[in-house]
Swiss-Prot record:
Protein name: Probable D-serine dehydratase
Species assigned in the record: Acidovorax ebreus (strain TPSY) (Diaphorobacter sp. (strain TPSY))
Pfam families (alphabetical): PALP (PF00291)
GO biological process terms on file: D-serine catabolic process; isoleucine biosynthetic process
Class of enzymatic activity (EC top level): lyase
């Protein structure tokens, strides 16, 4: 079982530093988590609250009739972009769980329509917020407009307004797909700056939808910086900043409201006797931070969120260990930032996301690429679900908590061990719907070869 590190202060001892530098799977537990979250959380010089999450959800609802008309795949849901909650008892062993340690579920964002990943949440929300703002400015909508009025934003007059503007983003893949597809569908000129580790099929999918793809030889951080700089020169360009955007973060947070209803519909309680553990793959941190913020706001002390990262790209763990006032890169730790989990190949975390998570996050853990491929196959064989390697990252989480001495010690210290049999473990799968069959076949072949 992977070794576990639990630093108790900002000054890290030699053991976790050595484990990170050796790219060994490890667990970090957050000593600054507050059981009761503040109603208003500080982030990036501002404050956000549950009201902001509800406003993001309301924006999705206002746009649902328009989205239903623009995207055929949303006709069955009335324009709602959501994913199912799936029982996964057949994956207990793969997740490191034994009898009496709780029930395993999957939040299947790998099935999300339009973008095929978790990025459909934040990315599409920011595009919709921009479209709404421009529509109000140009008289296409009024503050009194209802959801049916939003259908008019697909008309030629609205598209002519949107066509004057460029929506740009820097991405390793999935956020680019989300932003590019949504912006292009509404009539914006969409530009996606993609890092060297972005998959070719994702570039092709964007180009097929009329999105301009700018390829960069460097990593995610370089692609974002290039996109940000280019957009800054054009007053009609809106840059979706994955490292800094609150609109993205709040779009992700809206998932918590729907998940709360799904849990209730499934008869799953979340309280002191029925804790909820959520395991979220993490790249720069905006998506899992947004979801964690929303979950902590709606479910309080009894939800414990953990971020999963590749051993060569643990940017969020590195940032949380360093604390505020520092902004380390994985390169500073002698790591390569090279991983087949392209959506998680990020060298430096989002500072706003890290600031927001300091009192909310329970911990982070890292996984090897080989583990991702093995678990991708285990998910396929047990459930029939097809996910990307990065989407498998959360499946290692339960084993870190229940299968290691430090994990069990933490569960005891938090008063969670006596209630473990009634716990729910929720693995958030983040992408996979649009992976081409030939690419998935290579994933599966590698996973089966590993045994």
């Amino acid at each position: 079982m992977p070794s576990v590190v639990s630093p108790q202060d900002r000054l890290q001892d030699d053991a976790p530093a050595a484990q990170l530098r050796r790219a060994e799977p490890c667990l970090w537990l957050n000593p600054h988590r507050q059981p009761i979250p503040a109603a208003r959380q500080a982030v990036a010089g501002d404050h956000i609250s549950l009201d902001d999450t509800k406003e993001a959800a309301a924006r999705f609802a206002r746009f649902a009739p328009l989205l239903e008309g623009v995207f055929p795949e949303l006709q069955a849901t009335g324009g709602v972009i959501e994913s199912p909650l799936l029982p996964a008892s057949s994956l207990h062993a793969a997740a490191g769980l034994v009898a009496g340690q709780g029930a395993l579920w999957i939040k299947a964002d790998h099935r999300l329509p339009v973008a095929g990943s978790i990025k459909a949440r934040g990315g599409i929300h920011e595009v919709l917020e921009l479209a709404e703002r421009l529509a109000l400015q140009h008289g296409l909508l009024t503050p009194q407009s209802d959801a049916d009025d939003y259908r008019a934003l697909a008309n030629p007059a609205a598209r002519a307004v949107f066509a004057r503007y460029t929506v740009a983003v820097g991405s390793t893949g999935n956020l680019g797909l989300s932003i590019g597809v949504a912006a292009s569908a509404l009539g914006f000129h969409a530009v996606v700056h993609m890092s060297a580790d972005a998959k070719e099929w994702k570039k092709q999918r964007l180009r097929q939808r009329g999105v301009q793809v700018v390829e960069h030889a460097g990593d995610y951080e370089g692609a974002v910086a290039a996109g940000r700089a280019q957009a800054a020169q054009d007053p009609f360009s809106h840059f979706v900043d994955d490292e800094r955007s609150l609109s993205l973060l709040l779009g992700y947070s809206a998932a918590a409201l729907h998940l709360r209803q799904q849990l209730q519909d499934a008869g799953i309680a979340v309280d002191a006797q029925h804790p909820l553990f959520v395991y979220l793959p993490c790249g720069v941190g905006g998506a899992p931070a947004g979801i964690t913020f929303g979950l902590r706001q709606v479910l309080g002390a009894h939800v414990h969120c953990f971020f999963a990262e590749p051993v060569q790209s643990p940017c969020f763990m590195v940032q949380m260990m360093a604390g505020q006032g520092a902004h380390p890169s994985v390169y500073d730790w002698g790591l390569t930032n090279r991983t087949e989990a392209d959506g998680l190949a990020v060298p430096r975390a989002s500072l706003p996301a890290a600031e927001l998570m300091e009192p909310l996050l329970s911990g982070c853990f890292t996984v090897c690429d080989d583990t991702l491929f093995r678990q991708l196959v285990q998910v396929l064989d047990a459930t029939g679900e097809r996910i990307e390697p990065s989407a498998a990252a959360g499946l290692s989480g339960p084993g870190f908590l229940t299968g290691t001495e430090t994990g069990r010690t933490w569960l005891h210290a938090q008063g969670l061990w006596p209630h473990l049999a009634q716990a729910t473990h929720l693995v958030w799968t983040t992408g996979g719907l649009y992976v081409p069959p030939e690419a998935y076949a290579r994933f599966e072949e590698r996973g089966r070869a590993l045994g």
